[in-house]
Amino acid sequence: MERLMIEPLTAEAFAPFGDLIDVLGPPDRLINAGLCGRHHDLARLDFDAEGRAGISLFDAQARTLPHVLDLVERHPLGSQAFLPLDGVPFLVCVAEDADGVPVRFRAFLTAPGQGVNILRNCWHGVLAPIGAPGRYAVVDRIGPGANLQEYPLPVPLLVEG
C-alpha cells in the first residue's frame, strides 16, 4: 500500500482543489450596528444552471489515523462546502483528474473550526472526521441530474500524519 502524507492546510496549497474557509484576520466589514464582523465571500460556490444551492446536515462517523483511502468521488454539477458544527477536525484528501481517473493525490487535515469548499468535478475522499464523530453543514447542489461519480481505488493509499 502506498503512503500519502498529510501536509499543512493553507489557502494557497488547497487553491487548485477549492477554498479554505476560515476566520483569518479582521472581518471584511462590520454589520448589525457594529456588533458583528462579516468575513465575506469565502468560497467559490459553483452550480450548473439546473441546480441551486442547498444546505444539508451530515452526521459522520469518527475515523483514525493512519486512514485507508480506498474510494474517492466527485460532483460534476456543483461544488461542495463542508462547515464543521462541532469543531471536529476532518481529513481532506483530493486528487487531480487525468481523463476521468484521479491522480496525484494530496491530503490535508483541517484545524478545529476550519471548513473547505471543494470545487466542481474535483476528486475527493469521503467525509472523515478524525478522532470523534462530527456534524457538518454542507452547502452543495440540489437539483436534477447525476451529480455523484465514485471511483474505487485499485490500490488503496495509507494516509498518515
Curated annotation (Swiss-Prot):
Keywords: Lyase, Purine metabolism. The keyword Lyase applies. It is an enzyme of class 4 (lyase). InterPro entries: RmlC_Cupin_sf (IPR011051), UAH_cupin (IPR047233), Ureidogly_lyase (IPR007247), Ureidogly_lyase_bac (IPR023525), Ureidoglycolate_lyase_dom_sf (IPR024060). Pfam families: Ureidogly_lyase. One of its GO terms (biological process) is allantoin catabolic process. One of its GO terms (molecular function) is ureidoglycolate hydrolase activity. The keyword Metal-binding does not apply. Catalyzes the catabolism of the allantoin degradation intermediate (S)-ureidoglycolate, generating urea and glyoxylate. Involved in the utilization of allantoin as nitrogen source. This is Ureidoglycolate lyase.
